[in-house]
Amino acid sequence: HLAVSAVVAGERFVVRMPKGEDGAEGIAREARLLAELAVGVRLEIPRYLFTAVNPIGPGERCVYPEVPGEVLGGREWRARGLLERGETARAVAEFVDAVHAFSAERARELGVPEWDPRTEFAEDLDLVRAQVIPLLPEAEGWRLVELWGEYLSVDGNFEYEPVLTHADVSLDHLLVTGDRITGVIDFGDVRIGDPDYDLCYLWSGAGAEFVRRVQDYRGRSLDERLIAKLEFWSCADHAIDVLHGIEHELPEFRDDSVRELRAALARVDGQSTGSL
């Protein structure tokens, strides 16, 4: 997407214009979904005013009032002490639960795709073995394959009621005003699938203790099964980024993703010997 900010009569608006078919489909899907989803979500999310002809590519552009708040990097979240505030974890917990409470059947009617993680990760493994493992030190390559196999082999990892998920709940998609979360953006990956996946990017970006507090507010536990899933996803996401960099001939992105993958593998082994 190309996103630009515009000021009209003193109010700020966002104009998003897709460059490809996937982006066009995403905007059309969001236009159908977000108006209904916003009814049950306390935090501000994009509320489309209208769509119109897209001047730079397929589909339509969308226009909506700018969601209040600013995007902060992980260091700034920590410098402001936001991850230690109970209200931060509570706001995230309420948002996640509100999204999950939206009717999955209605989401299907609105065109939200379904995610079959067991099938997709099984298909990805062959490519990971062929293209990603050779870029890693031998021990790290074996560790990644081990994590992948453990995830796929545990039936309990796939025993869940499919729900609507944001699927990209990360610190840079939670907008902050002062010391509180005021909005959530980037619904481009929304899908029907494993509810645990909405903790994936918080696990890698905000840390285990923050995820534990989110789960406490949700009345749920952070047990060993969930920890293992989150550890796997944190590594698999970077491995798939490596594949993306290779497929699209983006050597810098590929190399950055390899470094991120190695760091994620190191964190997994560090956490597995810690107090969790």
Task: Describe the function of each predicted region.
Residues 1-116, 159:
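ATP-binding pocket architecture of kinase catalytic cores
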Residues 2-7, 15, 146-199:
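Active-site acidic catalytic loop and adjacent metal/ATP-binding pocket
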Residues 46-47, 73-76, 107-112, 184, ...:
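Short, hydrophobic secondary-structure boundary micro-motifs
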Residues 53-56, 68, 78-90, 101-167, ...:
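An alpha-helical support segment within catalytic cores of ATP-dependent transferases
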Residues 189-192, 200-276:
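Helix-rich C-terminal or lid/interface subdomains of diverse kinases
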